[in-house]
Amino acid sequence: MANNEGIDNSFLDTVKFDAKGLVPAIVQDHETGKVLMMAWMNRESLEMTLERKKACYWSRSRNKLWLKGESSGNMQDVYDILIDCDGDTLILKVSQIGGACHVGYHSCFYRRVLENGNMEICDTLMFDPEEVYGKKS
């Protein structure tokens, strides 16, 4: 049974953005709990995500809003958003269309570290990034 006593229900005012106005968002498959990726959100991307129910992030490399799947078609339908006890980290539970990772895998966490220190691929390749984004020059 949920107990809402003492909880400030104003979500956006509860989020503690860092000095750059960002908060980390861990993205999970809403059915399996599998971690798909980690991305950054600012207030505007979070508001857009809440409004559209499609994941929108802040691209630090491009310095602009990034609607996930906008160029690749690999959208994320948002089912749930959780906030941690400190208010400084989010979890987005999504339905992933295609791969979450820009290199083509279902999850960005597609490499497992072995006991000997080597790595192995532990996930499914969903698409060829050159076909989706074009060849890197």
UniProtKB/Swiss-Prot annotation:
Cofactor, free-text remark: Binds 1 Mg(2+) ion per subunit. Binds 1 zinc ion per subunit.
Pathway recorded for this protein: Amino-acid biosynthesis; L-histidine biosynthesis; L-histidine from 5-phospho-alpha-D-ribose 1-diphosphate: step 3/9
Reactions catalysed, as given in the entry: 1-(5-phospho-beta-D-ribosyl)-5'-AMP + H2O = 1-(5-phospho-beta-D-ribosyl)-5-[(5-phospho-beta-D-ribosylamino)methylideneamino]imidazole-4-carboxamide
EC primary class: hydrolase
Keyword Plastid: no
Keywords: Amino-acid biosynthesis, Cytoplasm, Histidine biosynthesis, Hydrolase, Magnesium, Metal-binding, Zinc
Main location as per UniProt: cytoplasm
GO BP field: L-histidine biosynthetic process
Cofactor(s) the protein needs: Mg(2+); Zn(2+)
Positions annotated to bind Mg(2+): 84, 86, 88
Alphabetized GO MF terms: magnesium ion binding; phosphoribosyl-AMP cyclohydrolase activity; zinc ion binding
Superkingdom field: Bacteria
Name listed for the protein in its UniProt record: Phosphoribosyl-AMP cyclohydrolase
Organismal lineage: Bacteria, Pseudomonadati, Chlorobiota, Chlorobiia, Chlorobiales
Originating gene: hisI
